[in-house]
Design a protein with these regions (language model features):
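A contiguous loop/helix-start segment that scaffolds small-molecule binding in enzyme catalytic cores
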Residues: 59-60, 64-129
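Class I SAM-dependent methyltransferase SAM-binding "motif I" and its flanking Rossmann-like core
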Residues: 1-57
Length: 129
């Protein structure tokens, strides 16, 4: 239903719950029957190896990210998963400036190059097909 609504250009807004990742997962339009919540990636030590270990993950992946590291994370995920992997970035969930952007990892990177990341982010990435 969510994927069909998005394809038809209908805005999808999930009702908030106790965690930000659930509305972001629903609004992403990506498969949510099976997913893995990764939280924040390590800042430095182990970051690349964690991302590399997820490159073959078949479930949808959910990450939290700060505005200061969003571009770095999108770039690293693009390098590890490929530029065409589908994803979404949601920010400021349940707040006045709530926004969800959907596309490939490379499209999202390009978008945020032009629009300075602000707010709290939830990044949802499709699993490996």
């Amino acid at each position: 239903l969510v994927r069909s609504s998005i394809a038809a250009g209908i805005e999808v807004i999930a009702l908030p719950g106790p965690t930000a990742f659930v509305p972001a997962l629903v609004q992403s339009g990506l498969p949510c029957e099976r997913f893995v919540f990764e939280g924040f990636l390590p800042h430095k030590k182990g970051r690349k190896s964690r991302i590399d270990s997820l490159s073959s993950e078949s479930r949808t992946m959910v990450f939290y990210e700060s505005p200061h590291r969003l571009m770095k994370t999108l770039k690293q995920l693009t390098d590890a998963f490929g530029p065409e992997r589908q994803a979404s970035v949601s920010r400021e969930l349940t707040k006045i400036f709530e926004e969800t952007k959907r596309g490939t990892l490379s499209e999202l990177y390009t978008y945020f190059e032009k629009h300075t990341p602000k707010g709290e982010f939830v990044l949802v990435v499709a699993g490996k097909p």
